[in-house]
Design a protein with these regions (language model features):
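Conserved active-site and SAM-binding loop architecture
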Residues: 1-139
Length: 139
């Protein structure tokens, strides 16, 4: 059985998929209070973290097989102001810090299509480069 942790968990899409796969949902991290209530309802035995910016994930180093997450999309979404890396909600650096602290075997990420075109793809290139620098094969 794989151990799974989720970042920017929302109402638990990745957590539900992990459960369907038979994985153990060890923790989730979500700042929105309503979403945390949903997560607690469905996964009461999972550790719940609120704010990725204030969470030390080193306690999970070497124990998480698969880490999932999609850092907030508002900075890149065509529906928003598209402030990109200047937006306070640009949290890729925090997700990268969590990856470095946890060192999971696999990382599964998702984001909006607008990330592909933001700054001619430079943000996506940075994300991919950061993951490769940590030893991950990016596909």
């Amino acid at each position: 059985m794989f151990n799974h942790g989720s970042l920017f968990s929302g109402i638990g899409g990745f957590d539900l998929a992990a459960e369907w796969m038979g994985w153990n949902n060890v923790f989730h991290c979500e700042i929105d209070p309503f979403c945390r209530k949903v997560l607690h309802y469905y996964w009461p035995n999972s550790i719940s973290y609120e704010d990725i910016r204030n969470t030390d994930f080193t306690v999970h180093r070497g124990t998480i097989d698969i880490l999932t997450g999609g850092f907030p999309c508002q900075p890149f979404s065509v529906a928003g102001k598209r402030r990109g890396t200047e937006d306070d909600r640009y949290l890729w650096p925090e997700m990268l810090r969590a990856i470095r602290e946890i060192k999971p075997e696999y990382v599964v990420g998702e984001n909006v299509h607008g990330l592909l075109s933001w700054s001619n793809g430079l943000v996506l290139e940075q994300v991919l480069s950061d993951l490769e620098a940590e030893g991950y094969e990016v596909q």
